[in-house]
Amino acid sequence: DGIFVNPIDSSKLTSLESAREAGIPIIAIDASVENKDLIDCVIESDNYDAGVLCAQDMMKRMQSADIVLLKHSTVESAVSRIQGFVDTIKNYPQYKIIDSAECEGQLERAMPVMQNILERHSKVDVVMSLNDPSALGALAAIESMKRTNILVYGVDGTPDLKSLIKQSPLVAGTAAQSPIQFGRLAAKNMYSILNRKDVPEIIEVPVTLITKDNIDTFNVRGWQ
């Protein structure tokens, strides 16, 4: 009767075209699609603000920084996160993006690409990662190469990264999403669609930056 989809590629969604032709309602969760006509509603974090929050926190901590970006450029939500970060620092030349790499948001991809970046650059101060798994990969690379003066940011608020915020001086923070809220909103809005009620085209869920300053107010073992 209805489909929930979490796109990992915003453009390659031929199966949704078939579902749309069949009149099946579709809600996208956590990431949108290029062709908005294929879906009834998208429920996602304020991904742009996630990047903004990470950049603002970095600027409070550091007067200048050489920055690396870990990206996933085929996913709209990941692009928005990195763009929010980049836009926040663009008028401050003391914050320089010295390198970037695609890692598909995966720990296993992020670790080797981060190792390659560290081999190219003797000075890296900050890593802005599109999500927490890539932040964990970056952290593994940094630790393996004994580069202990680099701060890492992620986006998600996963239990793994929240635990490391408490334990590791290298983990600066994560802009936390709320999958629990996603699920509630998805179910509520699909029910409305099936009952022929109008729903918003876009529902943005606020994000919260988790750092050492506020980590004790969050459930480290679970999601928000």
Where do the language-model regions lie?
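Short, solvent-exposed amphipathic alpha-helices that sit
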Residues: 50-54, 77-95, 109, 113, ...
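Flexible loop/hinge segments that line or gate small-molecule binding clefts
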Residues: 2, 10-49, 158-171, 219-221
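Hydrophobic alpha-helical segments within soluble ligand-binding/sensing domains
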Residues: 42-67, 79-80, 109-111, 158-162, ...
